[in-house]
């Protein structure tokens, strides 16, 4: 039985991933978080509390015993309060997670990034996502998954105006997003979570980058998982 560690459990995708464990799985799920989620957890899901993700020793200790890392950590510049604070979370924490998981000989690291992420992007947000991706790829894991979803659909516990507007547009005018723009169509958080689960339960030894439409395709191909 493999042990999957999940960070970013209280976000939209993190919660969707947890809900997948309401069904029997040949795997153990452990959440590593600052506090226990305020929603009911499936039976058998463990929570390890860590007050400071920047305490490297404490972080590595909390991650001990895992095989696969599911990283759904991500905030917004508005919520973080500044670009510097955002960078500290969306790059700094991921760098430390990758380092600890590598030192603990994890087999896989699976990270939810963003569509159009690139270290060469002129957009600060997307550049940070690209840097986080690079920090993971530089480590020698057997399996690496980088997921780059477009706008996420689902019931988020926190209100994000930009996402709400985007969700409304995507629901009413999806036919505008055709050809090269098809990749920007919204995607269900549950679909992203399923892709993460399939990859974390895989025995493949590879590095895969999934653009938003590829996440949907991969999930469909593994529908009987």
What are these regions (language model features)?
Residues 15-17, 41, 80-81, 120-122, ...:
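Short glycine-/acidic-enriched loop or helix-start segments at secondary-structure transitions
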Residues 3, 67-68, 108:
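Structural motif
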Residues 37-38, 42-96, 100-103:
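NAD(P)H-binding glycine-rich loop region in Rossmannoid oxidoreductase-like domains
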Residues 73, 110-113, 150:
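Active-site beta-alpha turn of Rossmann-fold NAD(P)-dependent dehydrogenases/reductases
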Residues 37, 76-77, 115-118, 152-153:
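Short, catalytically relevant binding-site loops at active-site mouths
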Residues 2-25:
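N-terminal Rossmann NAD(P)H-binding glycine-rich loop of SDR-like oxidoreductase domains
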Residues 9, 24, 119-208, 213-219:
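Oxidoreductase cofactor-interface core, primarily capturing Rossmann-like NAD(P)-dependent enzymes
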Residues 12, 30, 35, 81-83, ...:
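Conserved Rossmann-fold NAD(P)-dependent oxidoreductase catalytic core, especially the SDR/UDP-sugar
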């Amino acid at each position: 039985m493999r042990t999957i560690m999940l960070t970013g459990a209280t976000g939209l995708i993190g919660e969707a991933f947890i809900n997948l464990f309401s069904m029997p799985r040949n795997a153990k799920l452990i959440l590593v978080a600052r506090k226990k989620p305020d929603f009911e957890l499936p039976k058998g899901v463990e929570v390890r509390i860590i007050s400071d993700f920047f305490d490297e020793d404490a972080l590595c200790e909390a991650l001990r015993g895992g095989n696969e890392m599911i990283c759904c950590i991500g905030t917004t510049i508005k919520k973080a309060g500044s670009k510097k604070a955002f960078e500290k979370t969306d790059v700094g924490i991921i760098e430390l997670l990758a380092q600890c998981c590598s030192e603990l000989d994890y087999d896989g690291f699976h990270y939810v990034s963003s569509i159009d992420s690139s270290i060469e992007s002129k957009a600060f947000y997307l550049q940070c996502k690209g840097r986080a991706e690079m920090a993971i790829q530089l480590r020698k894991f057997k399996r690496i998954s980088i997921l780059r979803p477009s706008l996420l659909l689902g019931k988020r516990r926190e209100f994000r105006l930009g996402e709400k507007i985007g969700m409304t547009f995507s629901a009413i005018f999806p036919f505008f997003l055709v050809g090269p723009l098809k990749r920007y169509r919204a995607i269900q958080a549950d679909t992203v979570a399923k892709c993460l689960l399939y990859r974390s339960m895989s025995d493949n030894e590879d590095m895969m980058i999934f653009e938003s439409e590829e996440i949907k395709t991969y999930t469909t191909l593994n529908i009987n998982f």
